[in-house]
Amino acid sequence: MSLKAIHVSEVPSLDHFPENPSLICSSRKANNKFVVVGHRGHGMNMSQSPDLRFSALKENSILSFNAASKFPLDFIEFDVQVTRDGCPIIFHDDFIYSEEQGVVYEKRVTEVCLSEFMSYGPQRDTGKTGKPLLRKSKEGKIHKWSVATDDSFCTLQEAFEKVENPNLGFNIELKLDDNVFYSSDHLSRLLLPILQVVSDIGNDRTIIFSSFHPDAALLVRKLQTTYPVFFLTNGGTEMYHDTRRNSLEEAIKVCLEGGLQGIVSEVKGVFRNPALVNKIKESKLSLMTYGKLNNVAEAVYMQHLMGIEGVIVDHVEEITEAVREMMKPSNRDADGTKPKPNFSDRELSFLLKLIPELIQH
């Protein structure tokens, strides 16, 4: 990949992106493909959840990525940040928490060097003991980051080198802090090292970039045209100072004005505004979703009926199996076009009106 100098005809995608990088569904429709993406690999961690699946494997780790690759996923999604010394690493949170002599402390991930980042948690060298790894919940509580099967942190380069399935796509989320102002120069310093790794060792792996930060998404599109860029949005389920982040309508504008290829919305944002699915498709943009509801097979099935092209999920095993059953030829009508149950337009319209009411609670 030569930054700023790649012809659009070389753009790959969720299903070998067409020369005009628009819809995933342009090729998806040809083979009725519904894309399933593993969230942070095999699923995110929520150590305090009673559901043990959320604490089975360390998220965003090579262990998690390779475990996810055993299932019929199209992509794994993971979060990339850049350390103080310019190394792209895979980690979700803005801060890393640890404890020394009973005192909890935090450090901003982008302000530590690679060697310090790698010193937290399990160590690859069996003779070393890593620093204790803690985590801050959304409620502000600090707790031990415990999982049943742990693994060390990893870099973006290692993901390319150690994820065993070469056909498993990478959805690289460009992770930035919502509470930090980034100038264009600052964004460039953060994005270029990531793009360089992809250029050097991306090889033939299918890749898409995504970001909640509109300027980061727009800039990565300007810096390269090899890989599609998706704008992540809460779809209006949360409010931000930057109004571009506050609705699906604004997300459409960002994509169309910046030449982005698609939107990844919180699924509740789509269910609350189902009419926008057609508007997004008419704009020749791809649409995928993320969120806890995507761990519910019925919610995933409803999205398939609505024309949404894919989902990011935590419960990889359960949802890939549900999608496999959903797409079986034996579960279709005689013409092979509509999976059962086959809702009438009136029934589907009723369901789409009902869902926004249900998810308000």
From Swiss-Prot:
Pfam families: GDPD
Keywords tagged on the record: Chloroplast, Glycerol metabolism, Hydrolase, Plastid, Transit peptide
UniProt keyword annotation of Kinase present: no
Transit peptide: 1-53
Any GO MF annotation of the entry: magnesium ion binding
Catalysed reactions, semicolon-separated: a sn-glycero-3-phosphodiester + H2O = an alcohol + sn-glycerol 3-phosphate + H(+)
Domain GP-PDE: residue ranges: 54-323
GO CC, any one term: chloroplast
Enzyme's top EC category: hydrolase
GO terms, biological process: cellular response to hypoxia; glycerol metabolic process; intracellular phosphate ion homeostasis; lipid metabolic process
Effect of gene knockout: No visible phenotype under normal growth conditions, but mutant plants show reduced glycerophosphodiester phosphodiesterase activity under phosphate starvation.
SUPFAM superfamilies: PLC-like phosphodiesterases
Needed cofactors: Mg(2+)
Record localization: Plastid, Chloroplast
Enzyme Commission code: 3.1.4.46
Entry comment describing in which tissues the protein is expressed: Expressed in roots, shoots, rosette leaves, stems, flowers and siliques.
Induction: By senescence and phosphate starvation.
Entry annotated with the keyword Repeat: no
Function: Hydrolyzes glycerolphosphoglycerol, glycerophosphocholine and glycerophosphoethanolamine in vitro. May be involved in release of inorganic phosphate (Pi) from phospholipids during Pi starvation.
PANTHER family, sorted: GLYCEROPHOSPHOCHOLINE PHOSPHODIESTERASE GPCPD1 (PTHR22958:SF1), GLYCEROPHOSPHORYL DIESTER PHOSPHODIESTERASE (PTHR22958)
Family: Belongs to the glycerophosphoryl diester phosphodiesterase family.
Name the UniProt record assigns to this protein: Glycerophosphodiester phosphodiesterase GDPD1, chloroplastic
Native species: Arabidopsis thaliana
